[in-house]
């Protein structure tokens, strides 16, 4: 597992965006601030258990965002990758074709 935890630099009320990339072997999550700077990222091999891996990495990202920005936070989420279409339907979030 690899993480980039630089959420200390974001302001309390700035919106954040999360991208989830579901590939053939890994799930990656990245969180961007309103200046398009990466403020959190993580990737994890899913070993064919995509749902559990998504829950894990997204929970890590949401926990970190909540620690820094509090519970009232504007967050948009989009999904991409070879396994992204099914995941976007499961999560009811937009799919972005790579």
Description of each model-found segment:
Residues 8-12, 22-23, 69-72, 88:
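Solvent-exposed alpha-helices and their adjacent loops that cap or buttress functional pockets
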Residues 42-46, 65-98:
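Short beta-strand-loop/turn "lid" adjacent to the catalytic site in phosphate-handling enzymes
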Residues 14, 19-56, 60:
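Short glycine-rich, Thr/Ser-proximal phosphate-binding strand/loop in the N-terminal lobe
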Residues 1-9:
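Flexible inter-domain linker/hinge segments
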Residues 13-15, 25-27, 72-74, 92-93:
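Short coil/turn connectors at secondary-structure junctions
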